[in-house]
């Protein structure tokens, strides 16, 4: 699991509340239920209105995916593909039928099975890349929900502040309460801006990044599957797949003992 999002969100909120304390403020003065209820509920409701029910019901799953991203290291994926290529070159493609069942990555496993079943290379490439494109579109929709929430939240907060100021004007006859009421009115704007920039927008950006990583790995797997099907030299397969990685992810090949 990559903890960057959890650490970043905690750090952002800690910095804000820490600054409030250092300035002599009371953290509980901004932990007001009505503004929180308005901002969170209004933001989620606005996002629901702008999409379809499937997008909204997937929020929890997308949130979990953003926070607990799991991926096979690229060098491990390449090692798996090279190992399969060596066996296929030595024993034939059909010999991979049992080995394919032990492959950890579902996409790679399905692609290998299709290759073993004799699917035409061009058709196999089209099917696998179509699956990558479909995943990319689905991930884009999931990230958009959080990006939209980040756009709505500040405006919802302003609505809360206006409502609070209306309440202030209703109590002008009680000057002793005005300071408290005005401060409370602006808490909604604070939570709107804070949740947008410290929660919703970062999660949306995280989902986009996770999608990029996962789709890149799927494309890497496609190239490996097609190379195995073509009977390519395992060393060439490894070199080709490593050439598709960013320089900082490339690890030197292990030399034979």
What does each model-found stretch correspond to?
Residues 7-27, 131-210:
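Helix-termination/interfacial motifs at the ends of transmembrane alpha-helices
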């Amino acid at each position: 699991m990559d903890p960057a999002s959890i650490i970043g969100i905690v750090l952002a909120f800690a910095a804000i509340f820490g600054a409030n304390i250092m300035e002599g403020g009371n953290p509980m003065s901004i932990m007001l239920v009505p503004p929180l209820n308005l901002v969170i509920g209004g933001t989620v409701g606005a996002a629901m209105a702008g999409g379809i029910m499937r997008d909204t019901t997937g929020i929890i799953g997308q949130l979990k995916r953003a926070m607990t991203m799991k991926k096979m290291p690229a060098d491990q994926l390449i090692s798996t593909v090279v190992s399969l290529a060596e066996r296929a070159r030595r024993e034939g493609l059909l010999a991979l039928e049992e080995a394919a069942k032990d492959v950890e990555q579902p996409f790679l496993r399905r692609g290998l099975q299709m290759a073993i079943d004799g699917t035409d290379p061009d058709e196999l490439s089209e099917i696998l890349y179509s699956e990558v494109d479909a995943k990319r579109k689905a991930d884009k929709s999931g990230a958009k929900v959080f990006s939209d929430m980040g756009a709505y939240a500040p405006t919802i907060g302003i609505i809360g502040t206006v409502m609070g100021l209306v309440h202030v004007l209703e109590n002008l006859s009680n000057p002793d309460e005005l300071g408290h009421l005005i401060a409370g009115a602006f808490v909604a704007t604070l939570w709107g801006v804070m949740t947008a920039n410290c929660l919703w927008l970062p999660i949306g950006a995280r989902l986009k990044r996770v999608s990029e990583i996962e789709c890149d790995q799927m494309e890497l797997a496609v190239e490996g599957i097609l190379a195995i099907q073509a009977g390519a030299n395992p060393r060439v397969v490894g070199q080709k797949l490593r050439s598709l990685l960013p320089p900082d992810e490339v690890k030197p090949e292990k030399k034979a003992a």
